[in-house]
């Protein structure tokens, strides 16, 4: 046995992979095949031999095809990039591979496909795009693949297939759209597929309405040759009355649509320069309408047109909103005079279309719209009182000149009335005080008159400095005598009052002789 070992050595060497000159590290290279799978690569490795015809890059972490990464591989025939992390394909990513026949992009994270992603692949026969996150196929996505025979799009999230999405696929024989989110498909979308032999549409949430009249009739007339017995079971998901029924078992009279109805409120709005504006357009109907905004061209030429930006994208077929309504938001930012004019909200579905006009007026001044004053909490102000704008506030300045003048006049009149009331009250109080007099004003001072009998003819009327009347007897004696004085025995009645006696205020005058 030991003698035969040298003879087996050349055979063992032939079984080992031949490492070509310049083969990337950790990859295995054969004559025209390079295998770099499951190496946790983040980019396409450098040093791949230019003559490589089959390249395996599956089960890695490649998130982006760098520009020029595949440029040296002009002889490539088969490229396997499945089970990676690709999120997008740049336009012209495979332009340097004109001989490529098979391209596998299964199980990546592709969310969309650009129309120029497959430029240069005129010889491509098989394209695997299953297991990605594609939601829409836009018009002319596969326009540059005239010789494509198999297109695998199953297990995505495709909810909208535009009418010209498959344009250019005149050689396509197999189309797999199963296990997506398709609710409908138009006759125009399948018209370019003149060579189609196998069509797979199962496991989609089909909406059985008037838009699918053609599909049921087409399958019954001749399209069934493209469908296997399993693929013919196109099950309805809605409306609820037709759920779980096969499209082929539903009568045409049951496939109905409700034309859309559109509501925009308000129909006219005035905005200031520099503001942002949002206007909602709500639509109802069945199937869910597709809502779009557009600006109606102005009749005058040379006037700049504002571009309206749709917020939320197109709703309707596959839109993310309520089952019976569609809404689109017109969003205008930094409003200028060019934004003024007439806009139109249109809602359309298979049952028809409806439009509602909306007019935007632009205030040439840059004054910001005034917000109404916020009333204080009920506990913070008396019941029934309303907040009033202050003279210096923005709300007061927003009032008209006539209104401001009227408010100012009313305030001045109220102030004048208050001053008059205060003056009248003060004057009345002063009069009452004078009438009452100071302390001691009601006192009567009694003095002796010793020069003669007490007769009223001898009384002399005097007035003090305050104008009060006084009857004084014997003016030679001072008022307020220090000691008590006795009245003459022959004059006056007995009063028991001395010369300096103070009489209570109610007694006006009292004379003692």
From Swiss-Prot:
GO cellular component, one term: external side of plasma membrane
Membrane topology: Single-pass membrane protein
Segments traversing the membrane: 406-426
LRR repeats: 51-72, 75-96, 99-120, 123-144, 147-168, 171-192
GO biological processes: positive regulation of synapse assembly
Residue stretches making up the Ig-like C2-type domain: 260-361
Residues of the LRRCT domain: 204-259
Entry superkingdom: Eukaryota
Domain LRRNT: 21-50
Cystine pairings recorded for this chain: 281-345
Stretches the record annotates as Disordered: 365-391
PROSITE patterns cross-referenced by the UniProt entry: IG_LIKE, LRR
Subcellular location(s) of the protein: Membrane
Span of the signal peptide: 1-20
Predominant location: membrane
SMART domains linked: IG, IGc2, LRR_TYP, LRRCT, LRRNT
SUPFAM superfamilies linked: Immunoglobulin (SSF48726), L domain-like (SSF52058)
Name by which UniProt lists this protein: Leucine-rich repeat-containing protein 24
